[in-house]
Amino acid sequence: MQRVSELLSFLSAFRCDFFILPTPVTCPRYSVKAMKILQTLPLLVLFSSCQAHKDFFTSIGHMTDLLYTEKDLLTSLKDYIRAEELKLEQIKKWAEKFDSLSEMATNDPEGFLGHPVNAFKLMKRLNTEWLELENLVLKDMSDGFISNLTVQRQQFPTDEDQTGAAKALIRLQDTYNLDTETISKGNLPGVKHQPTLNAEDCFELGKIAYTEADYYHTELWMEQALQQLDAGEESSIDKVLVLDYLSYAVYQQGDLEKALKLTKRLLELDPEHQRGNGNLKYFEYIMTKEENKSSSSDSKDAEPKTKKGRPIDHLPERQKYEMLCRGEGIKMTPRRQKRLFCRYYDGNRNPTFILSPSKQEDEWDKPRIVRYHEIISDKEIEKVKELAKPRLRRATVHDPVTGQLTTAQYRVSKSAWLSGYEDPVIARINARIQELTGLDVSTAEELQVANYGMGGQYEPHFDFARASNTLGS
């Protein structure tokens, strides 16, 4: 409970989708372990599958559709392989048949052709059977597979999706302080599967960081790729290519000595590398220039060289935000913890909850934040998912400059909005929220269903405009 309380305390300063309510009727405390379903009333976070759409990386639901697309393609590929194998078996039988006849005939050509049946069959083979074999060899068994692939390719992810997925992985790396080797080996905490990254995967992550001018992460992932290649891993990429990217990324971070060392190693592998030779001369020139400068000046005045680290983030609360994601951050004192309780709440004597009170849990004291459990049934949840599935679209944010809604890199999710008139289930949920909180939902937003994508992200924010960020300005 303490870890959740810390998170909620921080989020309460930004967006808070929980309700702060008057002190309820206190009932005997029950075990929190008995609470099976946790639902935040105005916002349901949904992981569901839906129709194919762009920006796959922003929705786990849409990404699950890709798994089934790939499975269908794999089935089609296996069918193609079986067809090709059957074709080869037939060709082998033709070859074996012709081989035995040719061996017999060439040993005694005149005697062989002296038999009229052999002469007839020779004419037949060359005029008919070899033509049949030609048609068999020319028969394209890939038509079915290619047709299916062409159709499915329309739903394939784009370069933007691949870049988004890579950025999400890097974001998780930073948030949870994970090193590249841990991620590469798949040893992530709390996961069921342990997929590994090969050297080519690590190189691709580094390359995407490079295109974003993020040389800090470029260095991390290129070094991991190089480490795996040095360990003997077979790969389609070579060390020269990795060293080319790595040396430049290191140079961009101010470590000229290491960049020079890496460039020399590159040239040992490929002495004719044009860019490597150019960089070597340039790095040596810069180092000589700096050495002359430092020797001519007072050593006491020389500033220590500091290597650039992780890129500076625009969000002032970034450090606290990531600490809370890791379960660190603000700690509540034992005295304050003792004031937090679990109770049955009757909605201020609301008839709906008198006989069947809701389960309420204190999460934070100041400001007061409570959590409600088992407010929505599994059946209702599935219905909400069913209704939202075809409507999920990339979530947007308000642009303070244009006043328009636009997508943002820091909001990696898709959303759908459901009204009470669309289905009785939504109407019941809205009525339940109103009865529990005492608020009139007729003036509230529609029920929002959000499906977060890979490394699901929505940075801390206010739901109101500040003086420095006026709406429409």
Write out the residue ranges for each language-model feature:
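Classical eukaryotic N-terminal signal peptides for Sec-dependent ER targeting/secretion
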Residues: 1-44, 236-238
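Fe(II)/2-oxoglutarate oxygenase catalytic core
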Residues: 31, 36-473
